[in-house]
Regions:
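PAPS-dependent sulfotransferases, especially Golgi type II membrane carbohydrate sulfotransferases
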Residues: 1-6, 150-153, 158-174, 189, ...
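Short beta-strand segments
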Residues: 8-10, 83-86, 108-110, 178-180
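PAPS-dependent sulfotransferase catalytic core
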Residues: 1-70, 77, 125, 214-218
Length: 270
């Protein structure tokens, strides 16, 4: 690729859309919300695997060229010098990404886990008449069944959390920068400076008081208006949780990245 490519990944409801909205203020950068590339990547891997009778005609070098070409063609019309592709799945693909893009880095957005669950439940409550794609458009359930669903190994949160731990403890952890939601909204300039330093990019003066991002059509189709809403001004807005106290406590010790003893690879965290 003629562009440099990096990845935004991490946990849901942790600021990845806000981060993309900020990064795209830089005319040299292209960034967006979660897109289809990670899914296409997985499909291609599956179709080139031994489950296909034609896999005998495909070796690893061809697989790599095909997957590399997927990125080249997807971003062929993008004039930006630096591309950021977003998906929670990228943390689980670091060995492949390291081979395809030796200079690529991954920015993983994280947040205190009970507030992720709280944020998803708040979306459900705010859209009481529109079942969400997050729960396969099912109108039933309670806050407890919804929390169990997203926290399960294949759930919106559980999969991303496990993928993050895989990347955090894996051999390519040096490619990883964790950006805490709490830092991003309370001190966005410090978070952005850390990202630019991590990527080796020249500084850019971002306007954190006038941020714009529009995904209303996508969110409406997902039955979850507000899913990718970004406030014009980046700021921390404390609020009480709407989760039952016992459910909140269930997740409040899950921020493993905050314990230095659990960071043997010295992953950078801002």
């Amino acid at each position: 690729m003629y562009q440099r490519i990096h990845f935004i990944s991490g946990l849901p409801r942790s600021g990845s859309t806000l981060l993309a909205a900020l990064l795209r203020q830089n005319p040299r950068f292209h960034a967006n919300m979660s897109g289809p590339l990670a899914g296409l990547f997985g499909v291609l891997l599956g179709e080139m695997s031994a489950r296909s009778e034609f896999s005998v005609f495909i070796d690893d070098a061809q697989r790599q060229r095909i997957l590399h070409g997927l990125f080249e063609q997807f971003y062929a019309d993008t004039s930006a010098e630096v591309v950021f592709d977003t998906s929670r799945a990228w943390c689980a693909r670091l060995p492949a990404l390291a081979t395809l893009f030796p200079d690529a880095k991954v920015i993983a957005c994280v947040r205190e886990v009970p507030w992720i669950v709280d944020s998803i439940e708040r979306l459900v409550c705010n859209n009481a008449f529109q079942p969400s794609s997050i729960f396969n458009y099912s109108p039933g359930g309670t806050v407890y069944t919804r929390a169990n669903g997203i926290a399960g190994p294949d759930g919106m949160l559980g999969y991303a959390y496990d993928a993050l731990k895989e990347a955090f403890h894996g051999e390519h952890a040096d490619r990883l920068l964790l950006v805490q939601y709490e830092t991003l909204v309370s001190d966005p300039r410090r978070a952005l400076q850390a990202i630019y330093d991590f990527l080796g990019e020249p500084a850019f003066a971002h306007d954190v008081d006038h941020v714009h991002y529009d995904a209303e059509a996508f969110d409406a189709k997902a039955g979850t208006p507000g899913l990718h809403a970004v406030r014009p001004r980046v700021e921390a807005k404390p609020r009480p949780s709407i989760l039952p106290p016992d459910l909140f406590r269930r997740f409040e010790n899950d921020a493993f990245w905050r314990d230095p003893q659990l960071n043997p690879r010295s992953v950078r965290i801002v």
